Each structure stands twice: as C-alpha cells, then as structure tokens.
C-alpha cells in the first residue's frame, strides 16, 4: 500500500494486493516478450541506470538485490552511488534518473507525508523529498484535496482507500518494503545528549 501500516489504527491504511515474495520469473519474462521487449543474444532486453540513495551500505545492498532480480528477466541494471549533494541535485533538481531507490517518511498524517510524494502540486523542481517521479493524476489530486479537508473519519478513510487503489494501479512508486526505525534504550545509559 502507498500508506504505511502505521495508519491502520486510524482506519486510513488499506491492505492492498500483495505480490509474491519470490516472483514468477517465467511469467515476467513472458509479459515482457509479449510486450515486444525481446532479449538480445546476451539475454539482455533493456538497460537501466539505478540511482541509490547514498545513505550507507544497506542501500547499496538493496540496489544489488534489485540488479540481481531484474537481471533474471533480462533487464541489465547499472548502479550509481554518489555523494548526497550530487544525488539530491540529480533526483530533485535535474530529474536526471531512470530509477531511484529512496524512502519516504509518512509522518503522523498522510497529508504531511503522503501527499508530497504523489500530488501534482508537489512537482517542485529543486525541492527535496517531494514528487520527484513527476507523477500527475487529476483524479488522485482531487482525492488528495478531499482527504485533506474531510472531517468525518469514515468518509476520510473511504477517500484514502480510493487513493491507495489508484496508486496501486498506476504504480508511480514501487513500494518494496516498509522501513521501521528502531529505538534502543537502557536506563543505565546516561549523558547521551
């Protein structure tokens, strides 16, 4: 789902169709073959550059995983890992990317953390951590606006269900996992501030 499961308590998170963890490589290859994306003599049907968020080794490994699984269906992925300022400029200023591994903070309400990644009004060249995919859907925009102002909890949940259905169908972003940050604490540990 495009909304974090953290919104489950508010009734805004919907369980959307989930795709198998292992995937069906034969079916994926057939879909691409049928769409006219034939493999060449080296088994490559297309090439893509994949920009990785430069926040450490976990993100590099995530990119290597995507490179491996897409390679199984003939998509040759080149990984690009740059320093933070270069990555920010490439993704949010120049829109100079094909695919991008990133994550979203959804914060305490979808208006704060979801709208900025999908609303047409959030296509703001040079502004970090907004709609860098430049996804635009007038129907979704109307629903985002309705979700922002609807005071009735049940009606608001219905609006966000429709939002999640549109995003599941259009897939401007492929959500691979839900990231949870850990907090480790011990009363014996003092003076960290």
Where would I find each of the regions flagged by the language model?
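DNA breakage-rejoining catalytic core of tyrosine-based enzymes
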Residues: 17-23
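Immediate post-signal peptide segment of exported/extracytoplasmic ligand-binding proteins
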Residues: 25-49
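Bilobed "Venus flytrap"/periplasmic-binding protein-like clamshell domains
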Residues: 25-29, 52-67
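Surface-exposed patches in mature extracellular/periplasmic domains of secreted proteins
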Residues: 40-41, 79-81, 159
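Short, well-ordered beta-strand elements
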Residues: 45-54, 78
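Short, well-structured beta-strand/strand-turn elements
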Residues: 72-85
């Amino acid at each position: 789902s495009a909304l974090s499961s953290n919104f489950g308590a508010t009734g805004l998170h919907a369980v959307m169709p989930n795709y198998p963890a292992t995937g069906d490589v034969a079916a994926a290859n057939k879909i691409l073959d049928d769409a006219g994306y034939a493999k060449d003599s080296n088994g490559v049907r297309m090439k893509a550059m994949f920009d990785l968020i430069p926040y450490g080794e976990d993100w590099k490994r995530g990119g290597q995983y995507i490179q491996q699984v897409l390679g199984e269906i003939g998509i040759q992925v080149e990984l690009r890992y740059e320093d933070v300022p270069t990555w920010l400029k490439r993704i949010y200023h120049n829109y100079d990317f094909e695919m991008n591994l990133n994550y979203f903070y959804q914060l305490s309400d979808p208006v704060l953390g979801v709208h900025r990644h999908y609303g047409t009004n959030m296509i703001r060249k040079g502004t970090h951590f907004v709609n860098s995919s430049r996804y635009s859907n007038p129907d979704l925009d109307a629903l985002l606006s309705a979700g922002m102002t609807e005071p009735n909890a049940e009606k608001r949940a219905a609006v966000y269900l429709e939002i999640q259905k549109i995003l599941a169908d259009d897939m401007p972003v492929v959500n691979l996992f839900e990231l949870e940050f850990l907090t480790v604490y011990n009363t014996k540990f003092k003076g960290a501030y």
